[in-house]
Amino acid sequence: MISKNARYWIWITLALGYNTDKINKLYELYTDIAEFCLGGEKEWRFCGVLSNGDINKLKSIKKSEADKIMKRCEELGYSIVCIDDSVYPECLRNIYASPAVLYVSGDLPDIDNTLSIGIVGTRRASNYGTHNAYKFGYALSKCGVITVSGGALGVDCASHRGSLAAKGKTVCVLGCGINYNYLPQNKDMRDAITNDGALISEYPPDTPPIGYQFPARNRIIAALSNGVLIIESGIKSG
């Protein structure tokens, strides 16, 4: 499934970036985002949301760049879910800086109508931490709870693997593109998640991991979760 407005929302994110509340403001202002995108500079200034720098970025980026990303998703069999789609999780619309676009591999569970718990923690987890992350992932999934985590080493991977062992639904929110081979040793886990849940990211499929993207994706993990279980964490952890 590729959203009918994917071209426009992808183009907007390429220009305005990610983790910005301007996405929320545009969503609230326009019933159909095509009106904004096709309105040109006059409309972009009239809406009152964008700075001169934002407008210059919109003018500099061609919509064909969004077309390339859409074609790539079609080739890879990924879904593109946008903020104005009916299947977009309502819980994500209610946060600061909602992601305009979700790239999805697998089937996004019904997060809005099912209990979901985030399980997070350090990449440098102790044996005790990884054991408990796995145990909680397994036990919660056995109770029909959707688990949500970030696919990183340590706590994240242990919780995902626990859910998979219980044949439960788990959602992995990545801080890179879903086609990027992040942590090759866990590719088997990511492949399994696409069969029993979903890999999701706000970044285009081949986007490499950059440090600031991981704290930013934490807002998505938190929003998708009715509660967050922190297994083990350092004082300065994101």
Task: Annotate each predicted stretch with a short phrase.
Residues 1-86:
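Short, small/acidic-rich helices and loops at N termini and domain boundaries
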